[in-house]
């Protein structure tokens, strides 16, 4: 049995703000093979599902909202990435999704628009079909693993 996954056609970058995560995510900025095979990965590609209620932090809308049936549908939002590193200057770094990375079959990467101010094109990683939150998070975690694996392969000329 063969699986031919759609692959990313260009390198994409996800801004990482270390304060948004419970653990140390710094190692994801320069991952290794061991991290690609880890049982658990940091939720680097998870969108904001709920508006944060943190005192002193301006409220912002969720990146994706579930329908009445509890499912997250295609073209209703998702995870923001850009085609250029360092777009968000306040970020601690960027998680790299190299060109040629396998896109999990239940996700899609949609090109949105060019942002003149940021001088970068915005893309959204979103569900390719309706799915529950836990399934979406699992698919996004698999995308992280695939990106780490592809980084490792590219570093070795594979």
Curated annotation (Swiss-Prot):
It holds the Pfam family ADPRTs_Tse2. Changing residue 122 to A: Complete loss of toxicity. GO terms for cellular component: extracellular region. InterPro entries: ADPRTs_Tse2. Its main location: secreted. It is found in: Secreted. Keywords: Secreted. Forms a heterotetramer with Tsi2 consisting of two Tse2 dimers and two Tsi2 dimers. Formation of the complex inactivates Tse2 enzymatic activity. Toxin secreted by the H1 type VI (H1-T6SS) secretion system into the cytoplasm of recipient cells. Acts likely as a NAD-dependent cytotoxin towards both prokaryotic and eukaryotic cells. This is Toxin Tse2. It comes from Pseudomonas aeruginosa (strain ATCC 15692 / DSM 22644 / CIP 104116 / JCM 14847 / LMG 12228 / 1C / PRS 101 / PAO1).
């Amino acid at each position: 049995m063969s699986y031919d996954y759609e692959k990313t056609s260009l390198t994409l970058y996800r801004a990482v703000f270390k304060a948004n995560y419970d653990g140390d995510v710094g190692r994801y900025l320069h991952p290794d093979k061991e991290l690609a095979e880890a049982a658990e990965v940091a939720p680097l590609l998870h969108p904001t599902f709920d508006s944060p209620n943190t005192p002193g932090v301006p409220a912002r809308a969720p990146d994706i909202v579930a329908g009445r049936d509890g499912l997250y549908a295609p073209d209703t939002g998702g995870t923001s990435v850009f085609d250029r590193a360092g777009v968000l200057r306040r970020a601690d770094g960027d998680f790299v999704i190299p060109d040629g990375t396998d896109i999990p079959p239940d996700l899609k990467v949609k090109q949105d628009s060019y942002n003149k101010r940021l001088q970068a094109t915005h893309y959204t990683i979103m569900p390719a079909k309706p799915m529950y939150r836990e399934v979406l998070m699992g698919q996004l975690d698999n995308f992280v693993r695939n990106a780490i694996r592809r980084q490792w392969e590219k570093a070795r000329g594979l």
